[in-house]
Amino acid sequence: MSMKTIITAVCAALALCGTCRADSLTDMNARNAKLPDYKALHNKIDNFSKPMMWLFVGDSITHGCMHTHTERNFVEHWMEIVKWEYGPKPGTRKDDIVVNTGVSGETATGFLPNAKWRLGQFKPDVVFIKFGINDANKIGDVEKFKKDLSAIVGMVRKAKAIPVLQVPMLTTDGRANRPAYAEAVRAVADKEKCLLVDHAAYWKEASGSDTAKNNWMNNDLHPNALGHRIMVYTIAKELGIEPKNSPTLKLPTP
């Protein structure tokens, strides 16, 4: 038996036992790396002489309210990564600003009237966009969701910022239209040629189904503190922003 065959067999066995979950992360990073925005993002973050403004827009999961039980949410973890861990020494990017404007219950449709103000107020370099959970619950029109998401991406680009779309993580509520909304985010990202973080794909690999792992969730819709750790891990891997010896990215991810 050749060494290649042995390695293939071992990887297959690891995948079956749930310990080999890197495929979606690697694939998404490769997809993102082909885009001009990926190079632009890395040029910005590697320019240590110029602080960056990072803006997060989204719903209660972005806000991180209540369901982490006072522990950090994924936006706060990201702040730790960029402001302290990234660069040749701790605190190299200490002057970066990370703004979380997540609103409980928000949808892409609901965000649109406020988008111009937020973009003008904060003048971001990068905007992380995460909608879909409440859009599926409250509106239920996938085509409208895609249209509104595209409009948000367009406004971000007009503001000379880099948009990063996020596919929402899995839930345990069993709602039938969740996969359609995940596909909608992917479709908009491809159409608009923008960076994408696919939480749902990684969570599906971890659970082996379309339902989130119970120990990553606080209730049917909201991730707990561990779930938020998984989210920032996914962001870092898929955008290729992984500080060497990062304590944040070494957090347990069972």
Could you describe each region identified by the protein language model?
Residues 17, 57, 63, 101-104, ...:
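Short glycine-rich loop/turn motifs that provide flexible caps or phosphate-binding loops at active sites
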Residues 24-101, 116-123:
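Serine-esterase "nucleophile elbow" of acetyl-processing enzymes
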Residues 23-24, 254:
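Mature soluble domains of exported/periplasmic/lumenal proteins and thiol-rich metal-chelating peptides
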Residues 8-17:
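Bacterial N-terminal signal peptides
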Residues 1-9:
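Bacterial N-terminal signal peptides that target proteins for export
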Residues 18-22:
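Sec/Tat signal peptide C-region and signal peptidase I cleavage site
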Residues 76-86, 90-95, 106-252:
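Alpha-helical cap/lid subdomain in secreted, periplasmic
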